Amino acid sequence: VAQVNARVPEREVQRRLELVKAAYREVAEKGFAEVTLDDIARRASVSKGVTLYYFSSKEDLLRRLFAWLVDSIHERMREAVSSTSGPAEKVRALVAITFPSPSKNRAFFRAFVDFCGLAARRDGFREVLERFYRGCREIDREIVRDGVRRGDFRVRDEEAAASTMRAIFDGLMMQWLAESDLETSFSTYRERCELELLRYLVAGSDRRRGSDPATKPGAAAVESGAG
């Protein structure tokens, strides 16, 4: 009996995860407004009643989905940067997991844009979005600090640099989503993201109008790595 009872929470955790993943696929395909609990239940091969047993409402389920995505992203980011040593390599590792493939990026950012819209209107989603960016900036800041300590990066403000890194990631990703040919343009945006991040970090606040990043220390490594 004890063994059976011990397995119940495990089964419930697994069922919740299955429903969350089903919700992600539905939102990525249809958008938040069009997705229903019936759609999610059908995707997970359960009844709507089962879905409501685990989540009180569609909004509750999608907020949990958003939180799950945030946790997953932070985990992948940490794994990526821990597998490399140099600051520039860590930046490249972040770009690689941020731009994995056209299909994965399209699915994720369609869902993410919906969640950002919800965060502007609903506190529960806003809190999750704040946690997302706080965690990303923390990881980015550690990379910046390491790069500055080694003399590879010349930014003066670690907090501002981490925020700017996020702006480059998000800005280029949003522009890519607006392209008519996502497949063909994908590699261009991924390469540009890597190049702009490293150029910014190497030049940092010391960069002046008309200055050439190639003249900065460490720029040769940036250019060779980006190519």
Which role does the model predict for each range below?
Residues 3-7, 21, 29, 65-94:
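Amphipathic alpha-helical linker/stalk segments
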Residues 22, 26, 97, 168-175:
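Amphipathic alpha-helical interface segments
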Residues 29-33, 84, 105, 150:
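Short coil/turn segments at alpha/beta junctions that flank glycine-rich nucleotide-binding fingerprints
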Residues 64, 78-108, 159-165, 190, ...:
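Hydrophobic alpha-helical connector segments
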Residues 90, 103-127:
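Amphipathic alpha-helical segments used for helix-helix packing
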Residues 124-130, 134, 148-197, 204-217, ...:
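Hydrophobic/aromatic-rich alpha-helical bundle segments in the mid-to-C-terminal region
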